[in-house]
């Protein structure tokens, strides 16, 4: 987890990838690792809810993998602006 941002009780856990070239399998692996890290964060943070996010340097054809958003850095600002309106499309991990 490279960046954690919390607003309105929801944590956004961001993993930044600086890869110039990547394939879908390496991105899928990164997503699964980020989901596991997010689960660990939630387990250690009482009453929390979190969304795993991958930020990349470059645009790709892939927008989501397993409901985890893949966000090119140049679209990050608009992603954050629209985050709460689109949260139902994203993987949210919370404590019961």
Predicted regions and their residues:
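Intrinsically disordered, low-complexity Ser/Thr/Pro/Gly-rich regulatory segments
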Residues: 1-96
């Amino acid at each position: 987890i490279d960046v954690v941002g919390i607003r309105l009780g929801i944590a956004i856990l961001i993993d930044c990838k600086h890869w110039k070239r990547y394939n879908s399998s390496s991105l899928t692996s990164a997503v699964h690792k980020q989901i596991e890290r997010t689960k660990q964060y939630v387990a250690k943070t009482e009453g929390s809810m979190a969304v795993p996010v991958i930020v990349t340097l470059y645009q790709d054809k892939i927008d989501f993998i397993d409901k985890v958003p893949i966000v090119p850095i140049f679209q990050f600002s608009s992603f954050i602006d629209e985050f709460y309106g689109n949260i139902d499309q994203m993987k949210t991990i919370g404590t019961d």
